[in-house]
């Protein structure tokens, strides 16, 4: 044998060793039993609060309790040494805004058999991960119904779904007079709402008390501009009204007609300060007599051209902003949520900074009917709220089937509901759908369609999944959405990147720190790409098992795992994988509606490079990635920094590698974003592989400190030597001339403002009698 042969064989041997090292060996099988039901005592826990758990079912002697955050095992204990009468407690780590999955399992040989799972949410504020439900029936029907028992049963189920906020729909008397009083000034025990339904005050209060015992928030509903026909007799002025012009050109008050109900709804100018003062007083009566935690504000969408009493044109979204701010100023400690019907006013609502999250009532026929439109809503909301607000959809399933009392089997269609929830949850949204029934119409009391037991159980699994993995699903906004290339060698399966495609598996990916998360959404067997399933005819997607996948990434992957709400209660399934030449290969055990695959690496990014015509290296703009400027990675891997020369008014961006075929870009949120050194506004969002390849600029040539925070996807660029300045607003004001307050009216240190250490948020700055809103990002 000659020398070349030995070299060739040596290279082949070395390659085989490398491949062997790259292969992550077989892992234990995870088997579904799910015969044990688990419950917790609350829907949400504050950091440091103890969780009380109960198991119901046959529990083998060798059963273990395991607590996971993602795939990481936080704690593990033998069940029978821990539990008394199948009840036990657990105190999670005192870390805020975290989701956990509790797994009950036992081993059979080397395999793990999952007996039951349940999620735990540790969050000091519900708005970080809102899971919104509703109630809409407050009647005992003349004693024929044990309403107290029903309330306990309904709220126990919502607690099992980890619903942490509940909207009270159509609970009030008149829209302009929500609390009805007797002649002696005490609240009426019974009254009729606008649809002439009977409402029992004690049942409203009972719901609130039970919800509070579960750690839920109770939110009352009302329009921002609604009044009954007799409102003038209750102190509402005609001059506050909202007017339209009829076919003859006459000005008539706009109203929402409700045939055969107690009254039509006559609309007021929401921005009218006298109307706002009137409603503040009415809301104070609400808060005085009921322990509500906030106000769900409603509207009726775009009403066309509108006028005030003096025939001035009214732009409703401006009025929404004014109304929200007035309600917040009146009761700053209370939650506010406002409906963006058909997306109307969504941007103005979110930009107030005074709503807990974005709430979008979406419909067909207005650009929101397709699955793809759901992501558009989330992405837009993220931008409007500076990536600080979550999105909750009001989206009514099986709408036509539910018309006028329902048709056919009068059941919610399980495949339609589950595929829509799978998409919404995978994209980072939530869905208000669960209450004393499942929503199918915009009139919440309408319970036209019932849920099957199969659907009720599936909802538990889906809400467990959304809660347990909330940090991966909703921990960072759509700016972290990436474009990972996902391929399969299965000949009869098509894998397509978002947006949805008929008869394909669709992948949606997101980078969450050192996790690359790939959501597989199953559209096999369907050509209907509308989320609505209006007639309840959607069938189950084609079950796909043992699906071979390859993901292209230039991260070094050290673990791959999968989880699905459709199997094994969402438990983690670690997957064997190989990695070679930037491609990670593994097999997904099953995909029914939705499976999440997570690729974990040691670091968020192993390198980061600055590229573009603004970057000067060897005299040339660094479009050639080998000419790009490398940034220095911090010890914790969360930030990258560099001081470099940049040309003014020329573009730059960031990449995580030197091969355009495999690297990821980090872009600007808006086209041609320019860092303005005259006002030194320095910190902005980064987007991963944005739909548009937007880049950044500086306004003048010079040396700049560049700091990239990958954990928050924020970019900071300042003139070299000024990087200690976090945010400085346009005017350099002497300390003694200004005062600053938060939105609750509490004074804030001027020194914090001047040295750039104010926390992110919205503040009111007052100078020489003038006030303005400032945003610290």
Functional labels for PLM-detected ranges:
Residues 271-357, 363-376, 385:
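Active-site neighborhood of glycoside hydrolase catalytic domains
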Residues 604-647, 657-680:
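Aromatic-rich carbohydrate-binding modules that target alpha-glucans
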Residues 126-147, 220, 224-290:
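Active-site-adjacent "subsite" loops/lids of carbohydrate-active enzymes
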Residues 17, 28-164, 168, 523-526, ...:
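Mature N-terminal, pre-catalytic/accessory segment of carbohydrate-active enzymes
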């Amino acid at each position: 044998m000659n020398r070349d042969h030995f070299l060739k064989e040596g290279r082949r041997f070395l390659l085989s060793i490398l491949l062997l090292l790259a292969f992550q060996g077989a892992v234990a099988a995870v088997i579904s039993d799910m015969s044990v039901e688990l419950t917790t005592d609350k829907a949400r826990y504050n950091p440091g609060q103890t969780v009380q758990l109960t198991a119901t079912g046959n529990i083998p002697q060798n059963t273990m309790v395991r607590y996971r955050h993602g795939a990481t095992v936080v704690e593990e204990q033998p069940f029978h040494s821990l539990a008394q009468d199948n009840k036990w407690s657990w105190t999670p780590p005192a870390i805020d805004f975290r989701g956990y999955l509790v797994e009950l399992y036992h081993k059979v040989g080397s395999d793990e058999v999952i007996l039951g799972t349940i999620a735990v949410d540790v969050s000091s504020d519900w708005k970080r991960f809102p899971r919104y439900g509703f109630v809409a029936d407050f009647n005992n029907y003349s004693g024929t119904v044990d309403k107290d028992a029903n309330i306990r049963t309904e709220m126990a189920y919502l607690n099992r779904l980890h619903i942490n906020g509940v909207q009270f729909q159509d609970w009030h008397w008149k829209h302009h007079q929500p609390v009805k009083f007797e002649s002696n000034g005490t609240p009426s025990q019974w009254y009729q709402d606008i649809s002439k339904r009977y409402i029992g005050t004690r049942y409203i209060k009972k719901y609130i008390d039970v919800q509070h015992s579960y750690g839920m928030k109770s939110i009352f509903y009302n329009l921002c501009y609604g009044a009954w026909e007799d409102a003038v007799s209750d102190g509402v002025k005609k001059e506050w009204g909202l007017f339209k012009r009829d076919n003859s050109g006459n000005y008539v008050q706009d109203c929402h007609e409700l045939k055969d109900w107690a009254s039509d709804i006559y609309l007021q100018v929401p921005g009218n300060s006298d109307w706002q003062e009137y409603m503040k007083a009415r809301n104070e009566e609400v808060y005085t007599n009921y322990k509500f935690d906030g106000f769900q504000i409603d509207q009726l969408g775009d009403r066309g051209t509108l006028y005030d009493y003096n025939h001035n044109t009214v732009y409703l979204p401006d009025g929404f902003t004014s109304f929200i701010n007035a309600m917040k100023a009146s009761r700053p400690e209370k939650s506010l949520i406002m409906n963006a019907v058909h997306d109307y006013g969504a941007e103005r609502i979110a930009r107030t900074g005074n709503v807990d999250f974005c709430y979008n009532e979406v419909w067909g026929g207005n650009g929101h009917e397709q699955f793809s439109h759901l992501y558009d809503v989330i992405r837009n909301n993220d931008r409007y709220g500076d990536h600080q607000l979550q999105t909750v959809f009001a989206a009514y399933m099986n709408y036509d089937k539910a018309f006028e009392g329902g048709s056919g089997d009068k059941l919610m269609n399980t495949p339609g509901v589950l595929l829509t929830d799978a998409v919404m949850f995978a994209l980072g949204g939530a869905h208000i759908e669960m209450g004393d029934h499942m929503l199918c119409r915009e009139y919440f009391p309408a319970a036209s369609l019932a849920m099957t037991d199969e659907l009720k159980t599936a909802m538990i699994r889906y809400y467990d999944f959304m809660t347990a993995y909330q940090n991966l699903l909703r921990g960072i906004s759509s700016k972290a959405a990436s474009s990972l290339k996902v391929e399969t060698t299965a000949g009869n399966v098509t894998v397509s990147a978002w947006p949805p495609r008929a008869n394909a598996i669709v992948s949606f990916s997101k980078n969450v720190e050192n996790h690359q998360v790939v959501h597989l959404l199953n559209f096999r067997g369907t050509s209907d790409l509308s989320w609505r399933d209006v007639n309840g005819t959607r069938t189950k997607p084609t079950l796909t098992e043992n699906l071979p996948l390859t993901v292209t990434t230039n991260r070094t992957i050290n673990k791959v795992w999968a989880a699905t709400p459709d199997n094994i209660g969402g438990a983690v399934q670690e997957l064997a994988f190989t990695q070679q030449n930037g491609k990670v290969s593994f097999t997904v055990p099953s995909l029914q509606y939705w499976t999440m695959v997570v690729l974990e690496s040691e670091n968020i990014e192993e390198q980061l490079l600055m590229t573009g015509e603004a970057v000067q290296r060897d005299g040339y703009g660094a479009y050639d990635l080998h000419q790009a400027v490398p940034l220095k990675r911090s010890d914790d891997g969360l930030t990258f920094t560099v001081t470099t020369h940049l040309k003014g008014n020329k573009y730059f961006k960031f990449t995580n590698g030197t091969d355009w075929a495999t690297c990821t870009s980090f872009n600007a949120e808006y086209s041609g974003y320019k860092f303005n050194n005259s006002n030194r506004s320095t910190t902005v969002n980064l987007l991963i592989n944005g739909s548009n390849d937007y880049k950044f600029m500086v306004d003048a040539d010079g040396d700049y400190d560049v700091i990239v925070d990958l954990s928050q996807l924020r970019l900071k660029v300042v003139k070299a030597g000024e990087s200690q300045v976090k945010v400085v607003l346009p005017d350099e004001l002497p300390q003694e001339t200004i005062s600053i307050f938060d939105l609750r009216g509490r004074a804030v240190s001027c020194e914090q403002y001047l040295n750039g250490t104010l926390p992110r948020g919205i503040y009111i700055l007052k100078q020489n009698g003038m006030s303005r809103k400032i945003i610290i990002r």
